[in-house]
Amino acid sequence: MIAMHYLIGLKTKDDVQMVRRRAAERGPVFDGMPGLAHKWFLVDPQDPAYGTFYLWNDPAAAVSFLQGPFFHALCQTFGRPDVLLLLPTAKTLPADTVPRAALGDFGGRLGNMPAIETLDPRSGAKIDLAFGETGKGRQFEIAYHARA
């Protein structure tokens, strides 16, 4: 299993609305995508940004995605983002759909909160995705959650 994350800065709050619409329209295409376990479409309306966080069961499927039409369309719309490939070190997924998530290095201090903890093998940085209201890290709305 590998994780993948990228973040795209948006110019205006109108762009945030466009990303929400895009997530609602395109999100279902990712449901059941071969090799993909989960994809979270993330939106930060305060500091306008669009992000994604993927969990892939099959690394070859992640490569196919990055070389395929969906990622190409994203690059045409927003420019090519810096994609982080991450190694999951711990995973506790929420039982139900949650509306919010946070990204950051929480250093295992989330208690029983559902989270995916990852390690960037290039830099050694920890990048965690915590589900729910954390009060820590960068806060996001979950615009869509695609799953296998």
Which residues make up each language-model segment?
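Short S/T/G/P-rich N-terminal loop/turn motif that feeds into the first structured element of a domain
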Residues: 1-37, 47, 61-66, 80-148
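Short beta-strand micro-motifs enriched in acidic
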Residues: 42-44
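Short, surface-exposed coil-to-beta transition loops
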Residues: 49-51
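Long compositionally biased, domain-poor regions of proteins
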Residues: 55-60
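A common structural junction motif
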Residues: 70-79
